[in-house]
Amino acid sequence: KKGVTLREDDRTFPCSSGLCACLPLDSYSYICLSPSSSTANCENDECISEDDW
């Protein structure tokens, strides 16, 4: 994407600052986890931080 800031993106980060977004394997909606939580149930075993969103 060119010239698009994070804030103008079509997908707003769904979690509070300091949390990360996990897409559960059995769900289509993100849940918010603390960065220290297990990501075993998340797609690709990852929890996406606001910086990485």
Swiss-Prot record:
Tissues/organs with expression: Expressed by the venom duct.
GO cellular component, one term: extracellular region
UniProt GO molecular function: ion channel regulator activity; toxin activity
Residue positions assigned to the propeptide: 1-6
Keyword Membrane appears in the UniProt entry: no
Subcellular location: Secreted
Disulphide bridges: C15-C32, C20-C42, C22-C47
Keywords: Disulfide bond, Ion channel impairing toxin, Neurotoxin, Secreted, Toxin
Membrane-traversing stretches: none
Biological function: Probable neurotoxin with unknown target. Possibly targets ion channels.
Entry comment, domain topic: The cysteine framework is IX (C-C-C-C-C-C).
Protein name, as recorded: Conotoxin Cal9.2f
